[in-house]
Amino acid sequence: VMKKSRISLLWQVLLAIATGIALGQFLPVPVARIFVTFNGLFGNFLTFAIPLIIIGLIIPAISDLGKGAGRLLLVTAAIAYGSTVFSGFFTYFSGRAVFPELITESAHTAAIIDNPGNMALKPYFTVEMPAPLDIMTALLLSFCIGLGLSAVKGDTLRMAAADFRDIVSLLIAKVIIPLLPLHIFGIFLNMTVSGQVASIISVFVKIIVVIFILHILLLLVQFVLAGIIGRKNPLRLLKNMLPAYATALGTQSSAATIPVTLAQTIKNGVSKNIATFVIPLCATIHLSGSTMKITACAMAIMMMSGMPVNTTDFSGFILMLGITMVAAPGVPGGAIMAALGILEGMLGFDETAQALMIALYIAMDSFGTACNVTGDGAIAVIVDRIDGKKENLMQHS
């Protein structure tokens, strides 16, 4: 077991996709159905767990924001949210322009994603696992309680929420993430047997290329803005952040990259106080790269399966996604786990679409994370400038 867990999640998922496709060519149906049965159970368990994940992550995230370091915290959170939402809309409109050329809706794929019942292999049995709460109920409840906790002085519920967050984080880290590769293996096995894996893989490759280009453009926009506001050279700022970018590619975790991000941000001339405050905070709340990937993948999967992609649905989705990303834990695959709720609740993604979404997301987890942490450096420059202005005003008055 120890050996296996040393392989990063990315490689586990890529391995799962490859073996799923390879074994799908010749695995006898009765054997393949065992994996498909696991998919049914795991998919149902995810449906059950998603509202709990939402409540466990969002309540403490919001209540902590409310009671924290006051003004500076709100400024940073607002900028991080704005950056995340901008990333979502930037991706959405780029996707509208580019994807229709790249993604042809194949009737076969559409039939599969719209209705997994059309898959070639059926599970031996299924166990219904109804969710304790509806997705929207969970979101609203989390906002009400989270905002309430930040206003009320009560510690009992706040500590309970923190404990519940720890439980949910354990659930994600010890149960869901380790089983994900097996889940993805089963989905790709089933799609191979059903004969439409080639069309899906070709779309995957195209999307990954598009997102790679988009995330570079996004970083340029973020740093040009930071350069204008902070009156510094944007390209020099960006060049200084490259070690953080490279580290994040390797670790695939914003949290693990903090020391490097911090050092490079200070090198960019951000005051030490601000940097030590903004960088760890942004590692958790600023996920513009993840938002970009989730938005683009969601669009692609919807286009592939012939679901209508319209701006009103996506606007609501992106605004919610921003909040969900603020709450998402900084572990590999954490963002997509937190986002499953609104993918299901607002865009109507079923289990198969969700599994494709997870596979596609994790397949490029590294440069999404790299985009997140590099952008943190830009936010630090902006917050430093805003804070500097405030201090000057205080001194003059």
Question: Each predicted region: which residue ranges?
Answer:
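Alpha-helical membrane segments and immediately flanking helix-loop junctions
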Residues: 113-115, 238-295, 322-336, 363-382
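Transmembrane alpha-helical segments and their short flanking loops
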Residues: 103, 295-397
